[in-house]
Amino acid sequence: MLKEVRPAILVMLALTLITGLLYPLAMTVVAGTIFPAQAEGSLITRSGQVIGSALIGQEFKDDKYFHGRLSATTAADPNDSTKTVPAPYNAANSSGSNLGPTSKALADRLKEEVDKLKAENPGQPVPVDLVTTSASGLDPDISPEAALFQVPRVAKARGVPEASIRTLVAQQVKGRLLGLLGEPRVNVLALNLALDAAKLQ
């Protein structure tokens, strides 16, 4: 019996060692050597302080900043552990809203957001990504169209010409990966940091 079981035990121990210890350690070393910033979470710092990650969206409410996609992340209800409460941009609880296309709550929220954005920029079509959440609820990027839609508000709040803000947006647009994958996008945190750093006139 032991003769038949021994090979299985040895294979299990060998695979556990390889896949559970050696491979993860090797990948950690390789990632830390070749892609140190990404391995640390693509953190963004200002004046030596970590202010965010290029991979996780943040909430910007001030009119002088570009706003990202809406977030549907939640947290446990402190009064009832069987329920959740909205907790936007909560990276510990990444998730979508799970509201389907027939949901009245979703339709009402979309209408409210669209109406608010139309009032902000009358006559312009509202980009879809400004009123919808992503699957993770934490997308850090918006489309170039969503960024350009917000230019009049940001320019007015900062008292600078729209053309200066448009130029800055154009500089922050990232193209498709390898020219094929994904869509052009703008990282909202990077754009807002560039906005603060720029001497716009």
Curated annotation (Swiss-Prot):
The keyword tRNA processing does not apply. It is found in: Cell inner membrane. Its main location: membrane. Residues 73-103 are annotated as: Disordered. Residues 73-84, 91-101 have a biased composition (Polar residues). InterPro entries: KdpC (IPR003820). It comes from the Bacteria. GO terms for cellular component: plasma membrane. One of its GO terms (molecular function) is ATP binding. The chain crosses the membrane at residues 9-29. Keywords: ATP-binding, Cell inner membrane, Cell membrane, Ion transport, Membrane, Nucleotide-binding, Potassium, Potassium transport, Transmembrane, Transmembrane helix, Transport. Coiled coil: none annotated. It is a single-pass membrane protein. It holds the Pfam family KdpC. NCBIfam families: kdpC, PRK00315.1, PRK13999.1. Part of the high-affinity ATP-driven potassium transport (or Kdp) system, which catalyzes the hydrolysis of ATP coupled with the electrogenic transport of potassium into the cytoplasm. This subunit acts as a catalytic chaperone that increases the ATP-binding affinity of the ATP-hydrolyzing subunit KdpB by the formation of a transient KdpB/KdpC/ATP ternary complex. Belongs to the KdpC family. HAMAP family: KdpC (MF_00276). PANTHER family: POTASSIUM-TRANSPORTING ATPASE C CHAIN, POTASSIUM-TRANSPORTING ATPASE KDPC SUBUNIT. The system is composed of three essential subunits: KdpA, KdpB and KdpC. This is Potassium-transporting ATPase KdpC subunit. It comes from Bradyrhizobium sp. (strain BTAi1 / ATCC BAA-1182). The gene is kdpC.
